[in-house]
Structures are given as structure tokens and as C-alpha cells.
């Protein structure tokens, strides 16, 4: 399975000194030692990455290891724009995460933004053919890090 890692948990996933690292350590272990891959794309996500430069270097290393799948920025941006246009929920600021799920088919999001979770799982944002994602928010969800659920995008090297 691939995983979209919300930038709000980069420190927890990648920094062993983080107070919450043990909760997110299974994610990094699954990527390093299993078939897990990080999925990302879109202008907003890349801008958020730009604010987390020390983690950008880690992402580059994972890309060299074929552990990253980049989704077409234009497709993500277009879908994000549609979601934002149709959105009546003014509290939502993670349209880009939902757009990455839709464009990539990735079914797992790693986040600790509890206010975003209801929106990320909100069925009305997704086409009927798209499965709603599961949320990894801590060690209790490590059963979601299962190789048997690898999304098609993570089985190929090409960018969608």
C-alpha cells in the first residue's frame, strides 16, 4: 500500500527525537523494510514541503530508493480546485490531500490533524468509483500498513 503523509506529521514520522515518533515509527519502518511508498503531488503539497526543507532531503533519498510515487501536479491542482469550489465547509484546508487520494487511488493517509479527518473521509468529495481512504494516526493503526493492499499506482514507476 502507498501512503500519503500529511506534512503535519513529517517530524513524527522522520525525526527519532520527536515526542510522538514511536506512534509513527511503524510508518517509516514499513516504507524502509516493506513495500510501502510515499505518494505526493500538487502545488500546495510541494509548497508545504518547501516549509519543511530538512524533510525534503529525506524524501529525495526515498525517491532514489524507489519509495516515492509522484502524482501529476496539474491533475492534483485541478481536482483540488474542484473540491474547493464545491466545498461548503469553511474549516477544510486539506483539499490537496483529498485530491491526491482521488488522482492516485492511494487509500491510506497518515495525519494527526483530527479536524481534517472527517473531511478526508467525507464521501461526497469522492467519485463513486474511488474508495475512501483509511487514516493512520498512531501505532494503533499499524495493521493498515499491509502489503496486501498495495494500490496500483505503487506497483508502477510512472507518474500519474
Q: What is each residue range found by the language model?
A:
Residues 4-5, 17, 21-54:
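PIN/NYN-family metal-dependent endoribonuclease catalytic core
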Residues 114-160:
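Acidic, PIN/NYN-like endoribonuclease modules and their adjacent C-terminal/linker elements
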Residues 34, 66-69:
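Short glycine-centered helix-capping/turn motifs at secondary-structure transition points
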Residues 52-63, 119-128:
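Short, aromatic/basic amphipathic alpha-helical patches
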Residues 1-3, 108:
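The start of beta-strands in P-loop NTPase/AAA+ ATPase cores
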Residues 10, 46, 116-117:
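A generic structural signal for short hydrophobic patches within well-formed alpha-helices
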Residues 11-16:
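Short N-terminal binding/cap micro-motifs at the start of the first secondary-structure element
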Residues 70-123:
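Active-site neighborhoods of divalent-metal-dependent phosphate/nucleic-acid chemistry enzymes
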Amino acid at each position: 500500500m502507498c501512503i500519503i503523509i500529511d506534512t503535519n506529521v513529517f517530524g513524527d514520522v522522520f525525526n527519532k527525537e520527536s515526542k510522538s515518533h514511536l506512534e509513527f515509527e511503524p510508518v517509516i519502518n514499513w516504507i524502509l523494510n516493506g513495500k510501502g511508498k510515499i505518494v505526493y503531488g500538487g502545488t500546495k503539497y510541494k509548497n508545504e514541503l518547501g516549509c519543511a526543507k530538512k524533510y525534503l532531503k529525506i524524501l529525495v533519498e526515498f525517491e532514489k530508493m524507489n519509495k516515492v510515487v509522484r502524482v501529476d501536479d496539474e491533475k492534483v491542482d485541478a481536482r483540488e480546485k474542484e473540491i474547493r469550489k464545491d466545498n461548503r465547509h469553511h474549516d477544510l484546508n486539506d483539499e490537496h490531500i483529498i485530491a491526491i487520494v482521488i488522482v492516485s487511488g492511494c487509500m491510506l493517509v497518515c495525519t494527526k490533524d483530527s479536524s481534517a479527518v472527517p473531511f478526508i473521509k467525507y464521501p461526497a468529495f469522492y467519485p463513486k468509483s474511488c474508495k475512501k481512504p483509511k487514516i493512520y494516526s498512531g501505532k494503533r493503526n499499524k495493521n493498515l500498513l499491509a502489503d496486501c493492499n498495495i494500490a496500483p499506482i505503487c506497483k508502477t514507476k510512472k507518474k500519474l
